[in-house]
Amino acid sequence: MKILFVAAEGAPFAKTGGLGDVIGALPKSLVKNNNEVSVILPYYDVVDAKFGDQIEDLFYFFTNVGWRREYVGIKHIFRDGVDFYFIDNKHYFYRGQIYGEFDDGERFAYFQLAALEAMEKIQFIPDILHVHDYHTAMIPYLLKEKYHWINAYHGIKTVFTIHNIEFQGQFNPSMLGELFGVGDERYRDGTLRWNDCLNWMKAAVLYADRVTTVSPSYAKEIMTPEFGKGLDQIMRMESGKLSGVVNGIDTDLFDPETDPHLAVHFSKDDLSGKAKNKAALQERVGLPVREDVPLVGIVSRLTDQKGFQLVVDQLNTMMQLDLQIVLLGTGYADFENAFAWFGHAYPDKMSANITFDLELAQQIYAASDIFLMPSAFEPCGLSQMMAMRYGTLPLVHEVGGLRDTVIPYNEFEKTGTGFGFQDFSGYWLTKTLEAALDVYYNRKEDWKILQKNAMTTDFSWDTASQSYEHLYKELA
């Protein structure tokens, strides 16, 4: 099967979040099953700086962006069995950052037009064209409404994946003629219109052959007003083609037996090294070195979406419990200041590291006893899976991907991989933390069972890619 991914970012070339992880890992995994896989990405300045000497120039052509002719350079690298093609245009992509420009609409309109026209020129006409988030959401529409005259494109099936429904790509409808070079009939009849704007994500949901999200629970949640961000009605209408597939993680990268960032390696059969990592981390971040006290780890952006209004609200109460907290992350100034204050007030209990450090993040995943993730909403979430690989038990708000990946502890059946609370409130966060501490202190054998359960759960991309491949085969 021939599969083409088109996305705004992809590891290791350019990455800001979970989308980049997916584009870096899923194609590589699909290749293992004898699929022919290619990826089209923008050629950002950050890509040029890191990989410019490895990437080859193939050719160039020009595309129409409204009334203008724009240069489209095609670059290529073959990596991990996947052909990566890059759309090169310095005006649009040499900005010092991937997103957040005043003309993002124009930048990604150009990218989508260039990617669609490049397929024929690179001689890769896919069976499945898989696009991601709003930056490429107009592609299913353009394929069927603008490029339908190209015979070679007639058999292409499209899949659209929503990584975060909050960012929908809402623009002035004049963009249809001025940038995409199409008429406004589909806007006037309501197909592309939402809240009196051109909505790219709505277009993708209506025109794609299948729509996926990054977890089954999130697929259900976005059909509700609480999580749908205004598009819940459209999601309910198109629910027949909507499904969820949990992302995987790179299990080679997050492996306690080989991780180069750890002080001591360990495994599910011998957890003695975990205690040594805990001591090394406590020493590094300035906490008292105590094996008997549970260490609660946090690695996150400090935002409302990640639930830190609950944590900050409950910090005073948490500091009265017999525990230590190590935090790594940046975000809202109010949250940063609150954690920093508690770090100064309770130096024996709280270490607040208001920065981001990849090595320290790995050490927190590996050395903590509990990993705190109380997100208000979480399409998938990767940190909880990373923590579980190291026998660190997640404590989560049971929402989205957190609900799908963390099984709450059952004291009667001795099952579970972590702890969870359903009501999004500080009270239940603290109550659940107290329950976890009770298991840590008073039910040591149960704790070991939970650790082993967590470490043996399969979060590899091979499992996730099988689900996508099944979906592709249904279409093709």
UniProtKB/Swiss-Prot annotation:
Disulfide bonding pattern of the chain: none
Keywords carried by this UniProt record: Glycogen biosynthesis, Glycosyltransferase, Transferase
Catalytic EC class: transferase
Gene3D superfamilies per UniProt: Glycogen Phosphorylase B
Keyword Signal: no
GO molecular function, one term: alpha-1,4-glucan glucosyltransferase (UDP-glucose donor) activity
Keyword check for S-adenosyl-L-methionine: no
Catalytic activity, as annotated: [(1->4)-alpha-D-glucosyl](n) + ADP-alpha-D-glucose = [(1->4)-alpha-D-glucosyl](n+1) + ADP + H(+)
Source superkingdom: Bacteria
Residues the record lists as binding ADP-alpha-D-glucose: 15
GO biological-process terms attached to the record: glycogen biosynthetic process
Pfam families listed in its UniProt record: Glyco_transf_5, Glycos_transf_1
EC number in record: 2.4.1.21
Pathway info: Glycan biosynthesis; glycogen biosynthesis
Alphabetical list of InterPro entries matching this protein: Glyco_trans_1 (IPR001296), GS/SS (IPR011835), Starch_synth_cat_dom (IPR013534)
Alphabetized SUPFAM superfamilies for the sequence: UDP-Glycosyltransferase/glycogen phosphorylase
The protein's role, per its UniProt record: Synthesizes alpha-1,4-glucan chains using ADP-glucose.
Entry similarity comment: Belongs to the glycosyltransferase 1 family. Bacterial/plant glycogen synthase subfamily.
Protein name, UniProt field: Glycogen synthase
Name of the coding gene: glgA
